[in-house]
Every structure is written in C-alpha cells, then in structure tokens.
Design a protein with these regions (language model features):
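Conserved residues in the N-terminal Rossmann fold of short-chain dehydrogenase/reductase
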Residues: 40, 67-68, 108, 203, ...
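Hydrophobic/aromatic anchor residues within beta-strands of the central parallel beta-sheet
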Residues: 66, 106, 170-173
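Conserved glycine-rich Rossmann-like NAD(P)H-binding loop of the short-chain dehydrogenase/reductase
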Residues: 32-48
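Rossmann-fold scaffold of SDR-type NAD(P)-dependent oxidoreductases
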Residues: 14, 81-90, 131
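N-terminal Rossmann NAD(P)H-binding glycine-rich loop of SDR-like oxidoreductase domains
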Residues: 9-31
Length: 352
C-alpha cells in the first residue's frame, strides 16, 4: 500500500460504518494519514465505532471524524466535503431481496446518492474518488444489479465531465462476494450451526466469487494508484459453489444438517465480474483487470477507420468459468477472514 500518497491527506468514506469502512480503518490508523472522515446515516453504528476506537486505539481516535448524513441528501454530503482530498464511496443498498421489494429505495441511494457524492466531489476539487460496485451490475436481472449498473454509468458520466475540466479523477471497482461482510452468508451459516439449527442453502449449484475484506481494500487501493478517469478495476478471484461453501463452514464449525430452501427473489445461478463487451477493452494487470473508459462522444463518424475490425471476446468472466475451489480450498479461503478466526476462538472458549 502506498501510504505515502495519503500522508497528511484527508480521506472521506461514505457508508463508512460498514464492513469495508472498518477494514479501511484497520489499514490506515497507524499510518501518517491526516484525517479519516466516516460519513453514514446510522448514529448508533457511528457511536459503536467511536467507542471501539477509544477502547482499542485511543492514540489514533483523534484522526477519525464522524459525519451523520445521507448520500440522498446533497447538502449533507457537501457539508462533509471541505478539505477532503480523496473519497472511497461505499454507501449502497446491497441486499438483493430488499431491493426487489423496495426498488425506488435502491434508486435513491445507489443511483441518485452516487450522483450527489460525485457532484459534490467535483465542485469541492477532490483529487480522487474510488467508487465500489458489485458483480451484480454485470448483465443485471434484479433491482440491486440494475440500480448498481446505472450507478456505474453515473460514475462514468461524471468521470468524463471531471476529466474535461482537468479536475477530479473518478474510477470504479467491481467485486464479487466479500466474505463475512454484513449481510453475507458465512456469518449466517455460523450462527445457524452455533444455534444447533440446520444451515439454509438456496441452491447448492450456485457459484459465487470469493474475496475477503482485506482483498476488497487492496482492490480499491490498486484502483486508487493506477486509475485513469472512468476506469473500472476488477480483481481476479476464485469461486466456489454454495454447496461447497456450506460444507467448508460445516467442516470447521460442525454439521447440524442442511435445508435447501430454493433461490430468493432476483438471484442468479452464477455472477459475472466482466462482460464480453468489457473484456474487449480490458487490460490484464497481473492480479487485476483494468477496463478502460469508452471516451468517444456521440459523433461516431470520426471514429470509423476503414478496415479495422474489433472481435468480441469469447466469453464473459464469470463465477462459473473462473478457477473453482473445492471444499478444502474453500476452507483455506474462508480461514483468511478475521470473522471466521474469531468465531472459531469463541467456540473453543465456550467448550473450555
């Protein structure tokens, strides 16, 4: 991590009380960053985070400032903006079933809220903004994915405007299932096992990309360091079937049985991290892909070159065709998370 880039700088994290915000704090607290601003609408989570900092890291608590607001409210985000150098935009409605039942709430937060953040950033002269997206934005079939796909296009449009003004660099990251983030399935499986109940599986043949929270932060940092305006960054990720993921959790925590409950509203059999169309513009950067922005304007005639043909990529990059982990590989993967490690320690302490 290029900590020197953040020396004496101010970083604003929208949705900062979530799993991503907690992990960013863990990465940055001991560095020479000037200030971290946590922007969110939940005062209880902010209070919990503040007490956690004062209890565990009192020497760094002064670096962190809390702002109560909502990305839906343009003025509240503007109030948090003075003096900000960089932004990690993580505020979102992300639960697929909730967005299916309340799609306009997803529109308000994921689309309009993102536009509010980016307009405020451009007007305030913020240097760099990294926005967090999800694989559900690629070939979307549900309200969560559709709103996030629109969010991405809002990002690209604002990135184009900011670049034309010679100002803020705006880019996007897209990642798959972040293990043990809030609302994800591994904590649910663990809670069900510890309660002595069977774990509930939607479809054992579903596949999902797997990455831990540290990898999510690493992806954002890679994008921060390498982005041109409007770029999309994707981490190369392993995948697992939901059935193997359940077996991996049972191998670590115990087998209390399994109930297959069927797919929920808006769920896919597999997820796509990069579409065929995006692969045409992608650059392999080792552990990551960069998808360059399409910076053409609407005057297409000037982009036509006689004899030039672009061939479509063979396939999308999906959780079905990426490297598939078996049960043992999935066990090793989920053991990279602090959540699973801590849950295992708690179980051992209860037995002692």
């Amino acid at each position: 991590m290029a900590d020197s880039i953040f020396k004496d700088k101010t970083l604003l994290i929208t949705g900062g009380t979530g799993s991503f915000g907690h992990t960013v704090l863990k990465h940055f607290l001991s560095t020479d960053i000037g200030e971290i601003r946590i922007f969110s609408r939940d005062e209880k989570k902010q209070d919990d985070m503040r007490h956690e900092l004062q209890a565990n890291h009192p020497q760094y608590a002064g670096k962190v400032k809390f702002y109560i607001g909502d990305v839906r409210n343009p003025q509240s985000i503007r109030d948090a903006m003075p003096g900000v150098n960089y932004i990690f935009h993580a505020a979102a409605l992300k639960q697929v079933p909730s967005c299916e039942f309340f799609p306009m709430q997803a529109v308000q937060t994921n689309i309009i809220g993102t536009d509010n953040v980016l307009h405020a950033a451009i007007d305030a002269g913020v240097e760099r903004v990294v926005c967090l997206s999800t694989d559900k934005a690629a070939y979307p079939i549900n309200a969560r994915g559709i709103s996030t796909a629109m969010m991405e296009h809002v990002i690209y449009a604002n990135a184009r405007v900011a670049a034309e003004r010679g100002g803020t660099t705006i880019c996007c990251t897209r990642y798959g299932n972040v293990m043990c983030s809030r609302g994800s399935v591994i904590p649910l499986f663990i809670d069900q096992i510890r309660a002595g109940n069977p774990i509930t599986i939607t479809d054992p043949n579903m596949t999902r990309f797997l990455m831990n929270l540290d990898e999510a932060v690493d992806l954002v940092m890679f994008a921060f360091e390498h982005a041109n305006p409007g770029d999309l960054f994707i981490q190369k990720s392993d995948a697992s079937t939901i059935g193997d993921l359940a077996k991996a959790v049972q191998q670590l925590f115990g087998d209390t049985g399994t109930n297959i409950i069927g797919t929920r509203h808006g769920e896919k059999l597999f997820e796509t991290l990069m579409t065929r169309e995006e692969r045409l513009r992608s650059e392999d950067m080792g552990g990551y892909y960069r998808v360059a922005a399409d910076n053409r304007d609407l005057n297409y005639d000037k982009f036509v070159v006689k004899g030039e043909v672009h061939t479509m990529a063979d396939d999308s990059y999906t959780s079905h065709n990426t490297h598939r982990l078996d049960v043992e590989g999935t066990v090793k993967k989920i053991l990279t998370t602090d959540y699973v490690q801590n849950a295992l320690k708690e179980m051992e302490a209860e037995k002692a």
